[in-house]
């Protein structure tokens, strides 16, 4: 067993299961995706550390604990069509791709888009499509989505993203107040429920001027 493979198993035991993420599908998906592929060579020693990993200036992979707990909140179904917002190098998209039917990986930074387009096929993520665009606008051409997954802390949830949810669709995000929440479209209205406490790096552009404060 390689050192990274051992670290991956330890991640599941020491960062995922121990934090009340009990879904075996999440364990299997995170255990199958080689997180080190998505981290710059100089930072691969941090690939499985319980901290966000900066993959480009101001762009991060979420720490495994927070990421796993967000996946659990999302209740990803095998039939889900997913929009993965701020996918960075594509790690979150690769994991989501093992849980859902299809994933659109949205990233604003051109260099990260190029990196994700190279890494994801090599990681076997055949049901993930990478696209470049403004994060707060989502990707209307692929809507509606059953799940929108936001990889970063935000002040607000933009109306443009909520409008792209299918009936019964969920949006999972960590608010800058330090609370993870799920927003659900039901009968044309948006409701929300609080999850767990979390502090993760902020996403640029998600300010109070582009949507409602919840």
Regions found by a protein language model. Give the residues of each.
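Catalytic, metal-anchored helix/loop core of enzyme active sites in primary metabolism
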Residues: 214
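Class I SAM-dependent transferase core
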Residues: 1-83, 91-94, 99, 112-126, ...
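Conserved nucleotide-cofactor-binding alpha/beta core module
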Residues: 75-190
